A protein has these predicted regions:
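Blade-level signature of beta-propeller repeat domains, shared across WD40, Kelch, NHL, RCC1
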Residues: 425, 436-469
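Structural motif
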Residues: 200-206, 248-253, 297-303, 370-380, ...
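Single-pass membrane-anchoring alpha-helices
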Residues: 2-38
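Repeated scaffold domains used in trafficking and secretory/extracellular systems
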Residues: 97-99, 103-105, 119, 173-182, ...
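Extracellular cysteine-rich, disulfide-stabilized repeat modules
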Residues: 289-291
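Beta-propeller fold detector
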Residues: 168-171, 214-220, 264-268, 313-320, ...
Length: 469
């Protein structure tokens, strides 16, 4: 083959290869464009427009990136839309309670800027648990912390942090409040926030970060609510509110709320004589609350709320071992399933209990007359028998000599059952500890367990000699 023929042959082969490559590139381009248009069902968006899933509210978004011949195709996987919680699973069977969380707020205040608080509680959305408290508009290491023993001021706000995160300066102030309750319906948070004059206070209902409704004090005597979580079932949330005397007849109402709007109000009915600071839990298809009788009884009132027909039934925890403080000692205390026991009825403290068949789990201070120590136990037949005093599975949460305070319940939905948890407020400062001028708290949290557990004590632990005065 002469040189000219070689050149012609090489050129022909090169041209053929180039032509094949050209058509391959065209085929790849056509394939890419076809896949792109097929993804959006041939509805091509304008340039730079993001195609959203339906529904357009995307709460947990996942984007999958696919690389194809240097062309990026974004494929959006639509999450399951948020649904209202119905709490229809059974209650978990437990043997006792295991440690869950402790925020150490007072100890941390010795060297950092931590809010002065009281009336803490815990509530969970479907993914996380949060701690709440009523702040005093100041940090502890601040002269404004003087005289924060006062319950109601215009500076108090509801604080919210992820559980275990102390209320630092970056904490969100959810609303203005000196009394509150919060709960998540499966789609958004509802906050009930009470503030204003003692004789003309306002309750604001904030849903998904927006003020939706409000109600004014109906008895003009310190409108107040639960100081723990409310409960939502299938989009309807219930909250117990009281207005009137703290040591006599008061006017208690149960409000039914849907996405922040009050849709119905029921008046307390049944045999409960005085109801404050209820600790409520879902008891499908309704809601059950165990409250504080600040007038006649050291046995705790019960409220059963029917979500569907808005009916209310009230009574008292039967257990012969009673849960309020002050109370008689266990050997001489008595109870009644329908009426207050008329033993050490004046004053009291927020607390909790929940039914377990005919039995009852409860928590209370160890000291019968003051807010010292904290214990939990199960009373056999305590939900059905007023003479029941058989106590099992007792646990010490805070030793007898250390301060405690309010306590309350919150519920956590698991894969197969609903667990009950509780928190204990660990109050420090005035009135009892006069070496400082402030009053604040930390918290400790336990949750029900079907496993084994040990012993211990989890007090606040701050040395007031190391604290700001």
């Amino acid at each position: 083959m002469n040189p000219n023929q070689k050149i012609i042959t090489i050129g022909s082969v090169s041209l053929t290869i180039s032509t094949i490559c050209f058509f391959m590139q065209i085929a790849i381009l056509i394939t890419t464009v076809t896949l792109h248009f097929k993804q959006y069902e041939f509805n091509s968006p304008p340039n730079n427009q993001v195609m959203l899933c339906e529904p357009t509210i995307i709460e947990r978004n996942i984007t999958e990136i696919v690389y194809l011949t240097n062309t990026t195709v974004e494929k959006e996987i639509c999450p399951k839309p948020a649904e209202y919680r119905n709490w229809s699973k059974p209650q978990c069977g437990i043997t006792g309670f295991a440690p869950f969380s402790k925020d150490n707020s007072i100890r941390l205040s010795a060297g950092g800027d931590i809010w002065v608080t009281r009336e803490p509680y815990v509530s969970c959305d479907p993914d996380k648990c949060y701690q709440f408290a009523l702040g005093q508009g100041t940090t502890l290491n601040n002269v404004h912390s003087n005289n924060t023993v006062r319950d109601r001021t215009p500076y108090r706000t509801l604080l919210m942090n992820e559980l275990g995160v102390p209320f630092h300066l970056g904490t969100k102030q959810v609303c203005i409040a000196w009394s509150s309750s919060s709960c998540h319906d499966g789609k958004a948070w509802l906050h009930v926030c009470i503030t204003g004059d003692d004789k003309n206070a306002t309750a604001s209902f904030i849903y998904n970060g927006r003020l939706v409704d409000s109600v004014v004090s109906w008895s003009k005597e310190i409108l107040r609510t639960q100081e723990s979580e409310c409960v939502c079932i299938n989009g309807t949330c219930t909250v117990v509110m009281t207005d009137g005397s703290a040591s006599g007849k008061a006017d208690t109402k149960i409000l039914f709320i849907e996405e922040g709007k009050i849709v119905h109000t029921s008046t307390l009915s049944g045999s409960a004589q005085h109801v404050e600071e209820c600790s409520c839990y879902p008891r499908y298809p309704g809601v059950r609350c165990v409250c504080r009788d600040n007038w006649k009884g050291s046995n705790r009132p019960i409220i059963d709320i029917n979500i569907k027909d808005h009916s209310i039934v009230s009574s008292y925890v039967c257990s012969g071992l009673v849960g309020d403080t002050p109370r008689k000692n266990d050997s001489s205390s008595s109870s009644h399933c329908l009426d207050p026991n008329n033993e050490e009825g004046g004053h009291g403290v927020k607390g909790w209990a929940f039914d377990d068949g005919n039995d009852v789990w409860m928590g209370r201070t160890i000291n019968e007359t003051s807010r010292l120590g904290y214990e939990t136990f199960k009373v056999i037949e305590g939900w059905s028998n007023p003479k029941s005093k058989l106590q099992i599975n007792r646990q010490v949460i805070v030793d007898r000599g250390d301060r405690s305070g309010y306590s309350g319940i919150f519920s956590v939905e698991g894969k197969s059952c609903i667990n009950r948890c509780f928190y204990v407020e660990l109050i420090r400062g005035r009135k009892e500890e006069t070496e400082v001028l402030w009053t604040s708290n930390s918290i400790v949290v336990f949750c029900g367990t079907s496993g084994t557990y040990g012993t211990g004590s989890w007090p606040d632990g701050a040395d007031l000699n190391l604290m700001p005065i």
